[in-house]
Each structure stands twice: as C-alpha cells, then as structure tokens.
C-alpha cells in the first residue's frame, strides 16, 4: 500500500505544479474563451491519470519523483527532491531529524508511517466514493416521481433547481414552477451541457478528486473546474443571443440559483456555482476575436508540452558530474574500502577512462540524499570554472554531490556497469 500511495503522491505533486500554472493563466487570460480554462483542467486530469510521461528539455516540472520509494524505505536519512532549493532546504532537515534510520531496524520509521498513510488514503477514497453513491441514490429517489414532458426531460415538484442526472443515459430534470421563458432558457443551458459532454467531465473530475483527496490544491482545482464548466456552457448558449435575450438569460440565472451546499457530484445544476460571476460574464460577453482563440489554443499546447512531460534525467557522465570531460582540470579517486583511505590524483588518460565508465553506467534516480552506506570509493572533479563535484560509489548505489552551484545531492540505483567501474 505504501508503494501505491507514494506513486499517487508523486503524481499529485507533479499535477500541483500544473494547477499553479493554470491558476496564473486564469488570472491573466480574462479575454480568452472560457472553454480554454476547461481544456486546461483537462490537461491537469491527464497528468493525474497517466502513470508515465516522456522526458523533455521543455518540461517545467521540477522533479518527476519528489518522494522516492527507495529513499523512503532504505536511505539513512529520508529526503525529498523537488529540485526547488527553498522547498528541499525547508523540508529535508526535519525529515532527517525525525525519521533517520535506526541501525537495528530493517526499514526507516518514515516507511512505516507511509504504509499507515496508504491505508488512511484507501479509507478516504472509500468514503469519497460512498458519499458520491449515497448522494446519487438520494437524488434518484427525490426525482423518482417526475412527469415526462419530452424525451428524457422531466418536471419534478421535489426540486428547486434544474440539473442533469446520469452519465450513460442523461436525463434533464426541471422544477415544475418554471414559466415558459425560464424553461426555454434552462433547457438551452442544460442541452449545451449535454452537447459539451459536461455530464462526463464533471463526474470524472470528482473521481480524480476522490483518488487524490489528500491534496488541498486539487480540491481548489475541482471547485474551479465546476465554475469554469458553467461559464463555458453559458458562453455557448449566449454567443448567438441579442442583448435583450442575454438579459433575460441572466435573470433566469438568478432565479434558478441554488444554495452553495448543493450536491457536488453527478448533477450538473443550472445556477449551481458562481452565479454572480456568471451573470457578470453573460452581461459583458463579447465574442472573442480570431487571434484570441488562436492564442488560447497555442497556450493550451504549450502548457501540455511543458507540464505533461518530465525533466530529462542524467544520461551520461557530463549530466552526472555537471560539466563535460574537456572542462575537467583536476580529478582524483579515494579508495574508502580499507581502514586507511588512500587518495590518488588521476591522469588525463585515467580521467578519460573514468568518464567513459560513467557514460556506460545504467542507473535509476532515487531522489535526494545526504549520505550513503558501504561506500568503497569517492571520485572528485574540478572544472576550469571552479565547479566541484563528488561521486560516492557502493556496490548498488551512487551518490552524486554537486559541491558548488547550490544543487541537491542525488542518490542513484546502479543497474549495470558498476562492476566495471569498481574493478577499474
């Protein structure tokens, strides 16, 4: 359960960076069509559901695996690696102080707490889904006695605001007290929801919220998704209306608004959220120019490229050390396997050989770390620009410590090539 929770935690953290970007874009793109905001939330959903991601130099995600399962379970001092120095420096000292491994223990204390957190997450997921099911069944019971007036359109005395109920075969339910003008405007709105497939997207958003209920940023994202769905639907309805019809539509919005405590799961209720903002948006609506629409599409593409991809991992010696072989002015190796460590300065040819062996290594990045057990050797490099890097080696792991530049030390699991490096 701990492994599942840590996987979801890392996906959640990666998506949180995207949510922050969407929040900024929502603030600065007031003139953009509202469907752009919904599309941006769709990109957030993709980030949450995709278990994999391609690597790209254009990625703006600081780290694809902020919390490494291997580091949490086995590292002497568990740490996170967000690649944001302010966050790492604030969190890691506390983790090291309270969750450092006990020499006689098989796993870190943090791993035990992570296992507990996994079961708490599962209970929370069950509670969220149970809430959705109970809300759906209660609403079904309320509308069980309804009068059909058209195909899949019903009048109901037990409701005060219209909504759509159902995912596969959606039905529109209208309060029986609506006059003809209100009914026409309400039906236009609800049918626009159906045309946009909003009766799919909102329940999907709630399911994702249920899975990631532990992340408050995603609660904010879901709330704004519900609001943006309504705004986008309003724009679809009023884009062909004249000024008088828009005013009538806005009046109906106010008349059909419902309390904020209304059900937030399956129903897509007319007037459900942000009524004041929706009325203001309707009254001031202007059809966006072509260049605004084109710019909105371009923004969505750029956001997808930058936030659906992961940052590239270190793939060669230059990536590990932080500078290329031709930039190295000094290199040495320390044999730490014996009681008395011995140090030898490497010649140019030996430095070439070490870089070639580092190039041949295959490894997986585990995360940030400050120490490593069973180190048998230490490599030390200095560049012409004064950059310094230390690499500590063990049988199955490698700790890369960029001494200069303010970067965090990184722990790697060695997959292949470590035997050749050790023998050399």
Model region roles, listed by residue range:
Residues 132-143, 304-315:
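Hydrophobic alpha-helical transmembrane segments in integral membrane proteins
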Residues 42-50, 287-312:
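Internal/C-terminal transmembrane anchor helices
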Residues 313-424:
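Function-determining sites in protein domains
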Residues 185-198, 205, 233-234:
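Active-site recognition of the HExxH zinc-binding catalytic motif
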Residues 43-48, 145-162, 231-239:
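Membrane-cytosol interface motif
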Residues 158-181:
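Active-site scaffold of zinc-dependent metalloenzymes
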Residues 195-196, 220-277:
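Short helix/loop segments within enzyme catalytic domains
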Residues 1-130, 134, 275, 312-314:
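Hydrophobic membrane-embedded segments
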């Amino acid at each position: 359960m701990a492994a599942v929770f840590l996987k979801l935690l890392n996906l959640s953290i990666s998506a949180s960076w995207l949510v922050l970007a969407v929040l900024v874009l929502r603030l600065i793109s007031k003139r953009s069509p509202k469907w752009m905001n919904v599309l941006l939330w769709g990109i957030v959903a993709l980030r949450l559901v995709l278990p994999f991601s391609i690597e790209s130099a254009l990625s703006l995600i600081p780290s694809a695996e902020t919390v490494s399962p291997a580091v949490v379970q086995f590292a002497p001092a568990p740490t996170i690696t967000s690649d944001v120095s302010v966050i790492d420096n604030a969190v890691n000292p506390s983790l090291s102080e309270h969750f450092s491994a006990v020499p006689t223990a098989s796993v870190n204390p943090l791993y035990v707490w992570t296992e507990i957190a996994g079961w708490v997450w599962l209970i929370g997921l069950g509670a969220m889904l149970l809430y959705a099911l109970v809300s759906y069944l209660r609403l079904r019971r309320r509308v069980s006695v309804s009068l059909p007036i058209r195909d899949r359109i019903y009048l109901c005395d037990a409701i005060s605001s219209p909504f759509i109920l159902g995912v596969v075969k959606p039905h529109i339910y209208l309060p029986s007290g609506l006059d003809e003008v209100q009914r026409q405007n309400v039906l236009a709105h609800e049918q626009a929801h159906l045309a946009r497939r909003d009766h799919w997207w909102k329940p999907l958003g709630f399911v994702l919220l249920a899975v990631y209920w532990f992340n408050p940023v995603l609660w904010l994202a879901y709330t704004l998704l519900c609001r943006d769905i309504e705004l986008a639907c309003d724009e679809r309805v009023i884009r062909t209306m004249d000024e008088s019809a828009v005013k009538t539509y806005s009046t109906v919005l106010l008349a059909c608004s419902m309390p904020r405590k209304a059900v937030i799961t399956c129903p897509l209720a007319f007037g459900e959220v942000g009524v004041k903002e929706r009325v203001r948006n309707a009254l001031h609506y202007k059809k966006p120019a072509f260049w605004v629409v084109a710019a909105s599409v371009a923004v969505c593409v750029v956001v997808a490229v930058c936030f659906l991809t992961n940052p590239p991992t270190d793939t060669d010696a230059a990536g590990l050390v932080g500078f290329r072989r031709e930039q190295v002015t000094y290199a040495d190796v320390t044999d730490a396997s014996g009681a008395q460590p011995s140090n030898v300065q490497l010649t140019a040819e030996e430095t070439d050989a070490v870089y070639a062996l580092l190039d041949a290594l295959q490894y997986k990045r585990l995360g940030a770390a400050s120490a490593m057990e069973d180190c048998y050797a230490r490599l030390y490099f200095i560049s012409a620009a004064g950059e310094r890097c230390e690499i500590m080696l063990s049988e199955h792991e490698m700790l890369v410590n960029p001494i200069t530049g303010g970067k965090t030390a990184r722990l790697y699991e060695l997959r292949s090539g470590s035997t050749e490096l050790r023998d050399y």
